[in-house]
C-alpha cells in the first residue's frame, strides 16, 4: 500500500524535507541524501509480500504468522500502516529517534490511530512488551551496522520476542 500523495504535506525542516518529485510521488529526503519514496512496493518488500519483485524480496515471512510487531524507524509510516490496514495486526509499536519525523507524521494525520509511536533510540529502548516480529528499518546500507551493533540489538531485543518470533534486520 501507499498513501495518497496529495494527503502527504510538503515540508522543509531541519533534518529532512518532503516534496513531490516530477512524477508526483512524495519523497522524504534526509540531510545525508537518503530518500524514502511513497511507493506501494516499499512495505511489501520489507514484509516479504512483494509478488512481482526480485526473488531476494519474496516470501521472507511465508508461513510465518505475526500479530504484534515492533518497528524501528518510522519514515512515512508505510510499514506500520500496512501492518494496520492490510495485515490487521493487533499491536503496532514504532520506535523513532527523530522528534521531527514523529511531529511530521502526527501533523500530517495520515497514520491510523492504532499505531503507537515511541520517541527513543532503538539501541537504548527498553520495554517489557513481547512481539512476534521486530523489524529494524533504520539501515540503508550494510556498512551502517557493524557486527557489534547487530549483537547489541540482538541482545537487547531477543528477550522481547515471543516464542517462534523473529528479529528482522534487512541488510
Model regions: which residues?
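The AdoMet/dcAdoMet-binding core of the Class I SAM-like
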Residues: 2-11, 51-171
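Class I S-adenosylmethionine
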Residues: 1-66
Amino acid at each position: 500500500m501507499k498513501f495518497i500523495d496529495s494527503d502527504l504535506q510538503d515540508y522543509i525542516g531541519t533534518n529532512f524535507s518532503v516534496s513531490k518529485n516530477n512524477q508526483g510521488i512524495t519523497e522524504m529526503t534526509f540531510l545525508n541524501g537518503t530518500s524514502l519514496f511513497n511507493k506501494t512496493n516499499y512495505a511489501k518488500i520489507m514484509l516479504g509480500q512483494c509478488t512481482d519483485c526480485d526473488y531476494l524480496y519474496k516470501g521472507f515471512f511465508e508461513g510465518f504468522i505475526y500479530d504484534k510487531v515492533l518497528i524501528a524507524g518510522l519514515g512515512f509510516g508505510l510499514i506500520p500502516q500496512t501492518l494496520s490496514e492490510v495485515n490487521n495486526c493487533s499491536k503496532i509499536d514504532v520506535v523513532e529517534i527523530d522528534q521531527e519525523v514523529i511531529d511530521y507524521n502526527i501533523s500530517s494525520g495520515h497514520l491510523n490511530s492504532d499505531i503507537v509511536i515511541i520517541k527513543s533510540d532503538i539501541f537504548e529502548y527498553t520495554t517489557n512488551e513481547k512481539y512476534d516480529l521486530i523489524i529494524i528499518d533504520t539501515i540503508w546500507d550494510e556498512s551502517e551496522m557493524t557486527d557489534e551493533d547487530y549483537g547489541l540489538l540482538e541482545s537487547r531485543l531477543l528477550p522481547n520476542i515471543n516464542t517462534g518470533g523473529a528479529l528482522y534486520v534487512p541488510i
